[in-house]
Amino acid sequence: MKLTCVMIVAVLFLTAWTVVTAEPHSSNVLENLYLKAHHEMENPEASKLNTRDRCQRANFVCDAFHHAAVCCEGVCVLVCAW
């Protein structure tokens, strides 16, 4: 019984904490994401999702520290491998 009460109080506290610390203008955040996506549709060069032209071919030396070195095909295991 006591454990149940403690759990209920903890859940209520965490719910209240989430509501209090939530971002007050969350609709603006979604609007900004929409505007950014719309801009990227108009200007494909601005899109960060278009990384196909920056990928590395097979046998290219890659490591976990160079995030720009993405293998076009396969995975990075010290070198781009199939």
UniProtKB/Swiss-Prot annotation:
Disulfide feature: 55-72, 62-76, 71-80
Superkingdom in the source lineage: Eukaryota
Distribution of this protein across tissues and organs: Expressed by the venom duct.
Location in the cell: Secreted
Signal peptide (from-to): 1-22
InterPro entries to which the protein is assigned, alphabetical: Conotoxin (IPR004214)
GO molecular function: ion channel inhibitor activity; toxin activity
Pfam families membership: Conotoxin (PF02950)
Keyword Signal tagged: yes
Gene Ontology CC, one term: extracellular region
Key words, A-Z: Disulfide bond, Knottin, Neurotoxin, Secreted, Signal, Toxin
This protein's record includes keyword Iron: no
Residue span(s) of the pro-peptide: 23-53
Family per record: Belongs to the conotoxin O1 superfamily.
Record comment regarding domains: The presence of a 'disulfide through disulfide knot' structurally defines this protein as a knottin.
Name recorded for this polypeptide: Conotoxin C11GB
Species assigned in the record: Conus vexillum
